C-alpha cells in the first residue's frame, strides 16, 4: 500500500469540523478514508469518581491522550490497523469498546486541538482550520450537548463561559497560524470544500 495522506481538520467547538470531514468522506468514499476523532482519545478516568470527572477541563490539551493518538497515527502511516478507543460522554470516561480502523489512502484527523501538538502537526499533509463565529458555535454546542450528551442548558452555558471560551482563546485559536487552509463560516462553504478536494487529489498524485 502506498503512503496514506493525513488531513487535519480543526477549529473551535461547533465550528463545522465534522461537516467538512463528512463532505470529504462523501466525495472520496469509505473505501478511501479512515476517520480519527480526537474526542475518542480523551484520557481514561477510571481512577476518578464521577464527581471529579465532571470537573475535568475537556478543552485543555492535558485532557487528551496524545501519546496514544500519535502512536495510532504512526501505525496507520506504516500500514498497520489500530483499535480506536471509545469515549462515553455521559459517564465522562473511556469505555472498553474499541473500533478497528484499517489504514486507508486518506486519514482524516479531526479535533479542537490537533494542531496544538507539534508531533501531530508533523504527521499532517494538509492542515485545515474551520473559522466560525463564536455565537454560531455556542448555539451548535448547546444543541449537541443537550440532545446527544444529556446535558442541561444551564450546565452548557456555564461550561462555555468558564471553560470553553477561555480555552478556545488560549489554545485553539492560536493554532490557526499552523493551518494551510482556513475556511470561513463553517462547513457549508462549497468553494472552500472544492479547493480542499483539489488539494487532496494533488497530494495523492505525489504519492502515486
UniProtKB/Swiss-Prot annotation:
Cysteines paired by S-S bonds: none
MF terms (GO), sorted A to Z: ATP binding; cytidine kinase activity; uridine kinase activity
EC code: 2.7.1.48
Residue numbers binding ATP: 11-18
Annotated signal peptide: none
Keywords: ATP-binding, Cytoplasm, Kinase, Nucleotide-binding, Transferase
Catalytic activity: uridine + ATP = UMP + ADP + H(+); cytidine + ATP = CMP + ADP + H(+)
GO biological process, one term: UMP salvage
Pathway info: Pyrimidine metabolism; CTP biosynthesis via salvage pathway; CTP from cytidine: step 1/3; Pyrimidine metabolism; UMP biosynthesis via salvage pathway; UMP from uridine: step 1/1
Main subcellular location of this protein, as a coarse class: cytoplasm
Gene Ontology cellular component list: cytoplasm
Subcellular localization(s) per the UniProt record: Cytoplasm
Keyword Cytoplasm: yes
Listed Pfam families: PRK
CDD domains: UMPK
Similarity comment text for this entry: Belongs to the uridine kinase family.
Protein name: Uridine kinase
Gene name linked to the record: udk
Amino acid at each position: 500500500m502506498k503512503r496514506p495522506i493525513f488531513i487535519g481538520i480543526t477549529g473551535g467547538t461547533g465550528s463545522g469540523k465534522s461537516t467538512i470531514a463528512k463532505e470529504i468522506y462523501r466525495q472520496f468514499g469509505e473505501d478511501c478514508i479512515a476517520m480519527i476523532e480526537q474526542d475518542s482519545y480523551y484520557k481514561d478516568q477510571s481512577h476518578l469518581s464521577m464527581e471529579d470527572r465532571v470537573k475535568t477541563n475537556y478543552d485543555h490539551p492535558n485532557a487528551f491522550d496524545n501519546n496514544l493518538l500519535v502512536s495510532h497515527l504512526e501505525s496507520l502511516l506504516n500500514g498497520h490497523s489500530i483499535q480506536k478507543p471509545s469515549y462515553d460522554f455521559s459517564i465522562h470516561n473511556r469505555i472498553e469498546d474499541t473500533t478497528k480502523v484499517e489504514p486507508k489512502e486518506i486519514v482524516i484527523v479531526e479535533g479542537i486541538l490537533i494542531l496544538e501538538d507539534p508531533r501531530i502537526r508533523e504527521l499532517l499533509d494538509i492542515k485545515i482550520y474551520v473559522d466560525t463565529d463564536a455565537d454560531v458555535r455556542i448555539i451548535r454546542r448547546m444543541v449537541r450537548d443537550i440532545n446527544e450528551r444529556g446535558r442541561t442548558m444551564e450546565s452548557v452555558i456555564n461550561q462555555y463561559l468558564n471553560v470553553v471560551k477561555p480555552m478556545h482563546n488560549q489554545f485553539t485559536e492560536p493554532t490557526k497560524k499552523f493551518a494551510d487552509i482556513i475556511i470561513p463560516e463553517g462547513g457549508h462553504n462549497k468553494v472552500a470544500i472544492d479547493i480542499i478536494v483539489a488539494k487532496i487529489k494533488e497530494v495523492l498524485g505525489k504519492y502515486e
